[in-house]
Amino acid sequence: MSENIKNKIEELFHSTPEGVGVMLGNKITNGEYTGEESIVFTVEKKKPLSELSPEEILPSQVEIDGVTYNTDVFETGLIETFACPSNVTSACYSWQYTPPGNRQTIRPLKGGVSLTSQNLQGYVGTLGFLAVDSATGALVGITNNHVVIADAYYSSFRSTTGILQNETSDSAYQTGDIQPSSSSLKIGEVLRYVPLSAPPTMNQVDGAMVSISQSVMSDSESFKQFGLSGTSVMPFATTSEINALVGNSLTSSSGRSTGVKQGPLCGLAIQGVNYVTGVSGFNLQGQSTVAYFNNCISFTRLNPDCQWPIYPGDSGSALVATIGGVDKIVGLCFAGGSTVGVACRIDIVAEQLGIQAWNGTTPEFVDLTSKKLVTVAGFNNTKTITCSGQTLWQVGVINGVRIC
């Protein structure tokens, strides 16, 4: 995908009304993907043309690099983060009346299972998959920052008069559905996350990393996704493979709330791979805020008119696609509406969070006694600093000084 197309999509996002998302995707007609590449606008709710103000009318065609694209408008509901209050009780929709097994305590640990943290008691999301920390070679668990981090914004967006939160100490628990969480459910500790920026700055990743205790995993089982049929190690898809995903109907996921979504009846389909949208529900010093994201994957049920490709509590789950006969992780799910899910691209997650795919071999494990905390004066938007040869990640705001 050319930079001109990406730039035009962001230009359209900023020039359209609040709440409109934009992507280059697959046109939908009568509830089916047509295969026609088009500029897709997503809206919370469609309205008759007669009810739209002049500013709300979207273009019927868009020209980019001499190519004219027809446009499509797709109703999504409100796009929001999908961790959920842990007391929410909920064919393809059996999860609405029979809680899926993803919510149980799963040992050995696998991807797709219920997760929470000490700093976010009262909420629950999904442990997406196990990966390798590129810096240490240690086995780690991957989820969203809004699943385990109380306030993931860069400190530069915070005020001394607001709530000051940090991740100096934060245990991770599986299952996340039994709260208050007991020590017997602890699987590790939160290590780091990709900090968020407030609008108009764009984000690409809602991601966090937790350590994994050797006692809760297995070399032969923990690379699997709970309930999915695949039994082989899943590599990360490459950038070119993700760019070619639009229309892929061999897409699946397993999450805490909706359970397994796989196969010709209950599977998923990729709608676009460069989605630009605002996402509500991020906590900034106790206030729910909107963050802007670009270069995201949007996905639907195989029938795009069917609801809930993702649901509150599924945040952090892996998005898996079959590419060349091989199941690969293509994204990290983090948001959605009633008819669309949104995932961070795994190539960007890997780069910004500093991870590699786990190949299933016996791994190293994080030595939690080696965790180090330092402080720097003032607020800033620096993700990492180097201290005594170590790379340290921003993890919030604290009163006090422990200078590097």
Question: Can you name each region flagged by the protein language model?
Answer:
Residues 1, 403-404:
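Short, solvent-exposed mixed-charge patches
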Residues 1-130:
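Noncatalytic regulatory segments and standalone regulatory/sensor domains
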Residues 29-35, 133-138, 323-328:
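Short, solvent-exposed loop/turn segments that connect beta-strands within catalytic domains
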Residues 40-42, 141, 318, 331:
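Structural recognition of the beta-strand scaffold that forms the well-ordered cores
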Residues 49-65, 222-234, 342-352:
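Surface-exposed flexible segments
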Residues 63, 68-70, 80, 94-96, ...:
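Ser/Thr- (and often Asn-) enriched beta-sheet segments in non-cytosolic proteins
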Residues 96-304, 312, 321-323, 334:
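Serine endopeptidase catalytic core focused on the charge-relay Asp
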Residues 298-302, 309-310, 320-387, 391-392, ...:
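C-terminal subregion of chymotrypsin/trypsin-like serine protease catalytic domains
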